[in-house]
């Protein structure tokens, strides 16, 4: 046995799983599901009756929460599906760099500089326009399965 102390750096996810299992029959519209390895928001669920050979099936129609693509999957209702852990966090916008990255202020006073400007034109114009006018903006960042993206912007007044 050694008397050495072990120091561990804390990581954001601490090895936590990016998804959790949930029975297909219990997933509802506006819930989340992983289809083809992508985190999606369910927009339509239909179930078929139990057939002669097997289970009732759930037909999911969902939209990828990051790229907006429509995906579909059919799963026996008694089987488990992966459901992504989806988090939404608000950060105050500090700066926009020339290369398209934003500088955000976290709750504990650190800066977060690893996010690009949104690709959605309306959201992009709202962020850039508000920043150029000197408004105090709060950006909502959605994160799931190791990906992050700016999904909304709020104006909290003009800078004093």
From Swiss-Prot:
The keyword Membrane does not apply. The modification Hypusine is found at residue 52. Residues 1-12 have a biased composition (Basic and acidic residues). GO terms for molecular function: ribosome binding; RNA binding; translation elongation factor activity; translation initiation factor activity. It holds the Pfam family IF5A-like_N. Keywords: Hypusine, Initiation factor, Protein biosynthesis. Lys-52 undergoes hypusination, a unique post-translational modification that consists in the addition of a butylamino group from spermidine to lysine side chain, leading to the formation of the unusual amino acid hypusine. eIF-5As are the only known proteins to undergo this modification, which is essential for their function. Residues 1-21 are annotated as: Disordered. The keyword 4Fe-4S does not apply. SUPFAM superfamilies: Nucleic acid-binding proteins, Translation proteins SH3-like domain. InterPro entries: IF5A-like (IPR001884), IF5A-like_N (IPR048670), NA-bd_OB-fold (IPR012340), Rib_uL2_dom2 (IPR014722), Trans_elong_IF5A_hypusine_site (IPR019769), Transl_elong_IF5A_C (IPR020189), Translation_prot_SH3-like_sf (IPR008991). One of its GO terms (biological process) is positive regulation of translational elongation. NCBIfam families: eIF_5A. Belongs to the eIF-5A family. Translation factor that promotes translation elongation and termination, particularly upon ribosome stalling at specific amino acid sequence contexts. Binds between the exit (E) and peptidyl (P) site of the ribosome and promotes rescue of stalled ribosome: specifically required for efficient translation of polyproline-containing peptides as well as other motifs that stall the ribosome. Acts as a ribosome quality control (RQC) cofactor by joining the RQC complex to facilitate peptidyl transfer during CAT tailing step. This is Eukaryotic translation initiation factor 5A-1/2. It comes from Solanum tuberosum (Potato). The lineage of its organism: Eukaryota, Viridiplantae, Streptophyta, Embryophyta, Tracheophyta. The gene is EIF5A1.
């Amino acid at each position: 046995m050694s008397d050495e102390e072990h120091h561990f750096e804390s990581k954001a996810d601490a090895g936590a799983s990016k998804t959790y299992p949930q029975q297909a029959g219990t997933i509802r519209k506006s819930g989340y599901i992983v289809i083809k390895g992508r985190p999606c928001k369910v927009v339509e669920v239909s179930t078929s009756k139990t057939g002669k050979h097997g289970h009732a099936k759930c037909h999911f129609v969902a939209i990828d929460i990051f790229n907006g693509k429509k995906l579909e999957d059919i799963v026996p209702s008694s089987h488990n599906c992966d459901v992504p852990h989806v988090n939404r966090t608000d950060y105050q916008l500090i700066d926009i760099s020339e290369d398209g990255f934003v500088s955000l202020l976290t709750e504990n006073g650190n800066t977060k500089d690893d996010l690009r400007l949104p690709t959605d034109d309306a959201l992009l114009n709202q962020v850039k326009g508000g920043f150029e006018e000197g408004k105090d903006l709060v950006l909502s960042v959605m994160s799931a399965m190791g990906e992050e993206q700016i999904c909304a912007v709020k104006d909290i007044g003009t800078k004093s």
